[in-house]
Amino acid sequence: MSNLTARVIPCLDIKDGRVVKGVNFVNLVDAGDPVESAAIYEENLADELCFLDITASSDRREILLHLVERIAEKIFIPFTVGGGIRTVDDVKAVLEKGADKVSINTAAFQNPKLLTYSSEIYGSQCIVCAIDVKHEKERDRYEVFLHGGRTATGREALDWAQEAAEKGAGEILLTSMDRDGTRNGFDIHLLKNFSSSLGIPIIASGGAGNPEHMVEAILRGKADAVLAASIFHFGEYSIRETKKAMEEMGISVRLD
């Protein structure tokens, strides 16, 4: 991690216009209205917001631009949008609707030049490469998965992340599919591997169960930001108390 302030980022996983949350990418349950959730998170000291239309890529349909626009009208914190972004025109459309960054997953893997073209036009600070990984126990490595975790690629995750950074990604959103929704803590080994090998910020995703897990991701995993969904959506913990736990452990955070 760099010496910058650590960021806490709530994630709105969107399906059919509603916030949903599942375990290991399946068994989805409704977690509320995205526009209301966005406004509440901003009031509660979220540093950024992440909006992922989780079935846009697998359903081959357009991202919910009207919803992006409604959320962008409500909030002033940086706002990342992903899901179903396949072309530079998609990047343009999302940014024009008010997003500050775009998160590209499947399409970036299938066409890495999309990262290059997008970063050349809009700047790498706008381009987040999202990578969903699963641990392969037999070979003790992490494999990249596409289409919301449905498609195995056979490619080693760090190898792809390094290429993505070279192609123009300004940040990596790294999700452990094994930990997703389990609330058992982040995969620290995975985070350490990525943060020590890449020169761009890493957002840790998958496994947050309490503020201590987020502290661990920053201090031990050396992540630059932590992303969480279920622990915030269902009200067990607030972003404010998460940040206070971080501050108590010497992590620089924004508290006003």
Curated annotation (Swiss-Prot):
InterPro entries: Aldolase_TIM, His_biosynth, HisF, IGPS_HisA/HisF, RibuloseP-bd_barrel
Record field: catalytic activity: 5-[(5-phospho-1-deoxy-D-ribulos-1-ylimino)methylamino]-1-(5-phospho-beta-D-ribosyl)imidazole-4-carboxamide + L-glutamine = D-erythro-1-(imidazol-4-yl)glycerol 3-phosphate + 5-amino-1-(5-phospho-beta-D-ribosyl)imidazole-4-carboxamide + L-glutamate + H(+)
A biological-process GO annotation: L-histidine biosynthetic process
The EC number(s) this enzyme carries: 4.3.2.10
UniProt keyword annotations, A-Z: Amino-acid biosynthesis, Cytoplasm, Histidine biosynthesis, Lyase
Residues at the catalytic site: D13, D132
Function of the protein: IGPS catalyzes the conversion of PRFAR and glutamine to IGP, AICAR and glutamate. The HisF subunit catalyzes the cyclization activity that produces IGP and AICAR from PRFAR using the ammonia provided by the HisH subunit.
Family listed: Belongs to the HisA/HisF family.
Protein name: Imidazole glycerol phosphate synthase subunit HisF
Gene responsible for this protein: hisF
